[in-house]
Amino acid sequence: MKKIKIGQIGIGHNHASEKMAAFRRLSDFYEVVGVVESDPEWKERRGNLPQYQGLPWLTEEELFQTPGLEAVAVETDGFDLLSTAQRCVDHGMHIHMDKPGGEELEPFRRLLDCFRQKHLCIQLGYMYRNNPAVNFCFKAARSGWLGDIFEVHAVMSRYDGDDYRRWLSGFKGGAMYIFGGHLIDLVISLLGRPQKITPYQRKTRDDNLYDNGFAVMEYPRATASIRTSVVEIDGMKHRRLIVCGTKGTVDICPLEHHSSRYHLDPLHVRLTLKEDNAEFKAGTHDVVMPVMQGRYDLQLTELARIIRGEIANPY
C-alpha cells in the first residue's frame, strides 16, 4: 500500500526525537520527507541527534509544498503547538500533535472544530491510549470483571534538573499541566466527565514552578486521584495506575518503561478478582503483556490506519 508522506515541525518537544525514530521504524506506513525547526537554539541542541540523521531540513513553507504530503507531526516545544497545528489544518494536513492542547480550552476547541469541518485527523500525543497494559485495564473494567468502579489512583512523575524547571515554569499549571493530561485522559475514558475537580498545586522550592501537583476528580459513586511531580527520584519507575471496583482491582506499576527498555521488558498487570470470569479465576494474577517495540509505535500505526481510512478515529 502507498506510504503516507509525513514531515515534522519542531524538535523542541521532549517527545520529538523518539517520535521521529518511530516514524522511521514504521517504514511500511510512512515516508518521512523532512524536518522543520525555525529556532536556531533548538536546532543547535538537538539537530544532530541520530533520529534526524540523513533527513532534509526544510522551511515550513517548503514542507507544505512537498508534493503528496499528507500529514505532519507537530513537535514544537509546547508554547506554540496550537498555532502550528492551525497552520497545518489550513494546508489540509492530518496531524499528530504532541500534548498538551494549550492553556485555554476555547482555542483548542476551535482547532478541533477546524479538523472536523475538513474531515482531517488530529491525533494527540496521549501514548497511554495505546499501552497494552492500560488497554487490558480498560477491558477488565468494560467487561464487568471489576464490578462498579469506586476508586482510581494515577501517578506520573519524574525528576528534572534546573534547565527543565526553568522551561516548565513558563506554564501556569507546572508539572500538572504537562503530565496530568495523560492521567486525566485515562480517568475520563473509565468514568466519563467528573462532577467536580479540585486541584492542589504545591512548590517544593522557592521558585516560580508548581512542581508537585495533585487533583481529585469526583463522581457520584467514585473518586479519582491524580498525582504529578518533577521532583520524584527515579519517578518513571513508580508511574502507576490503580483501578478499584466492587469485584476486583487492576494495578499497573510501572505504567511504562524508559524508551530503551520497551523491546526488552514486557509490562505487567496485577489483577485481583472476587469472582471467576471467562478468562481468569478468582484471586490475584500477574498478567504479562506483549512486548512493545517502542513507546509510540502502536499509536503512530493507529494514525496511519486512520489516515488510510481503515479505521475511524477512536477519539
Where on the chain are the PLM-derived regions?
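Contiguous beta-strand/loop segments that form the cofactor/metal-binding neighborhood of enzyme cores
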Residues: 184-261, 297-311
